[in-house]
Amino acid sequence: GPNGNGVVHSAKPPTHWSEKNNIRWKVPIDGAGASTPIIWKDKIFLLSVIDTGNVDPSLPRPEDQPKRVFDITHPNTTYEYIVLCLDRKSGETLWRRVATRLIPHEGTHRDNNYASASPTTDGKLLYCWFGSAGLFCYDLEGNKIWERNLGEVKIGASLGEGCSPVLYKDKLVILRDNRGQSTIQVLNAKNGETIWIKNRNTRNGWATPAVVEHEEKVQVITTASRPEAGNRKTPGKVISYDLENGKVIWECSGLTDNAIPCPIVENGVAYCMTGYQGFSILAVPISGKGDQSKNILWKRELGTPY
């Protein structure tokens, strides 16, 4: 929804549909994509990746690679990273752009792929984040405005990247939690230049931050996995940053591993959760400063999503 909390008060979606009922149109989309399409007026924007099948003979074939967890293999073929714009009324392709072509540096889980981050727009510019393959900015007619390569990261067990960019006015938030040096950074949305970047003491994560206004400040609320996988003595955290400068406004401990669900903020309370190697959901007031671990409104340790 428009506030990132799963709610659209003005929506009137159909409650029943099938292959034939309540379907206005249906069109095939080439490739694979796990990101959510977005809508601006009469345009739909979505991302996809296509395996071209063009093999680099210098790289090992998937069947010749050592066995990895979940049978994940590293590609040896070139992929095209696609940005699509469809007509909302008809499904017709208005424009299609190949953002980049490259061989991904690592594999992904079978339930993930290389187009997992959802695009975002302010109605003027469109921001498309393909993780280690790059960040691309277009106008709504498909003209490329700028692009940036923010470097490669490696995700534990090669599960793949998945955190989406968040746009607030003229700032773009990029969170990159991984098995190396995790970071959060804010870019100038007009030209892609870095405004600030901060290191994070956490590991793999896929949770998109929540950006909220509170008491004349804009907070970037993030969840963070345990810095040491499986070590219950070092719990995961909720960390709130000042959008302007990256300073930590408040934080609290109490999460488990693999931060995947996005924080939800409602009526001054952040609801944050993790669901791997234990369950945890925290309700934390966003009005605090510093360590808020003892000021949690409530906590539950069951039934959280993963």
Feature locations, PLM:
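Noncatalytic, solvent-exposed loop/strand surfaces
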Residues: 1-306
